[in-house]
Structure formats: C-alpha cells, structure tokens
A protein has these predicted regions:
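Mature-chain termini and adjacent capping regions
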Residues: 1-197
Length: 197
C-alpha cells in the first residue's frame, strides 16, 4: 500500500514536539507504531490505528487507544490520539542529561493529544497535565483544561475551565531551588508560562 509516506511523516510530526528539550538521540531513532488494527485510505490520506496504540521513538512513548493521522490538501499533517473511555492519553520522554547522575523525564497526559503541523503546535486537552521528574522524584508540574505548546517559539499556554469553578483553574508547581545549586546561577523554570497572543 502506498500509505507509508502518510503515516510515517505524520508520525514524524507528532513526535517532533519533544525535540527541543528531549533526548537528542531520540530523533535519530526509528518510529514504531503498534496497535491491534490498522486502516489506511491512500485516496483520503488517512491512517487510523486502533486498540492499545503505542508510539515509540527512542525514549519517547505515547499510549492511547486510537491514533488518526491525516494530510490536508495543502500537505499539512495532523494527528489525534485518544484514549479508551475513562482513561487518558499518556506520553513520557527522557531529557538530555544536564547534570551527571541526574536523569530527567517529561510526562504528560490528557483526554486527547493533537499535533497540528500547519500551526506547529501540540495540544493536550481536558484533564491535561505535564510534569518533570528527576531520578523518579516529581519536580515541576502544570495542570489545566488545555495545554498548547508552540513548537516554533517554545512557548506554552495553559488554559483553565471556569465552568468547573475553582477546580477548573490552572495550577503549576515549581520545585524549590536545590541547596547544592550554585548561588550565582539563575534557576531554570520548568513550569508553565502564559504568553500574550
């Protein structure tokens, strides 16, 4: 089937979100997509993976129940991963090591993970959460109804859901400064930031 280029390049786009801070070697690894079923339509430029879908590239792992990859008439790729009812889409990826002996991981989850190549954004929606851990210890965490990460300028917008009342607010936890850290070195913020449109 001629569909290989469609899902392959869609998957590349889907997986490119982590390259700025992710393990550099991951982008050089093959992309593997596993599922219980695959349906492809070369004419409509659609590839659908269903049933315990797992996407792997190096240390990057994305898990859900359904992955829909499409290419629009202008050639832009779009990918949407959704979970089983009552579950969440999850991803994790190791970051490049900055400090010897410290292994950092990024973890995320939400009801839906979307990659939009035209806008060059990655979006986690509904019960969205992104966290960073060091050697298995949670360091920073951001939660909201929608997390939009712009791959072009490395900015994030986290939106709450006011309709949910106080529980619909955005929350961010930032780890305190490490007492072993050089006092003259600025603290690298790993949480979220709100940017003006």
């Amino acid at each position: 089937m001629k569909l290989r280029p469609i899902w392959f390049f869609c998957a590349l786009g889907l997986l490119s979100f982590g390259t700025a801070h992710a393990e550099t070697a991951d982008s050089e690894q093959p992309i593997q997509i596993f599922s219980d079923k695959f349906d492809g339509d070369d004419v409509k430029q659609v590839a659908i993976y269903t049933g315990d879908v797992a996407v792997h590239q190096g240390t990057l792992e994305i898990h859900g129940n359904k992955l829909v990859l499409t290419v629009d008439p202008q050639g832009y790729r779009h990918a949407v991963m959704t979970p089983l009812k009552g579950k969440l889409v999850t991803f994790k990826q190791r970051r490049d090591q900055k400090t010897p002996g410290v292994e950092e991981w990024m973890h995320g989850k939400g009801n839906e993970l979307t990659y939009d190549e035209k806008r060059n954004v990655l979006i986690l929606t509904h019960r969205a959460e992104v966290a960073r851990s060091e050697n298995g210890v949670l360091k920073d965490e951001s939660k909201g109804d929608k997390i939009t990460y712009n791959l072009t300028n490395s900015t994030a917008i986290i939106d709450g859901n006011k309709a949910k009342g106080p529980s619909g607010r955005v929350s961010t936890v930032i780890a305190p400064r490490d007492s072993n850290m050089d006092a003259g070195k600025p603290l690298e913020l790993q949480g979220s930031r709100r940017v003006s449109p």
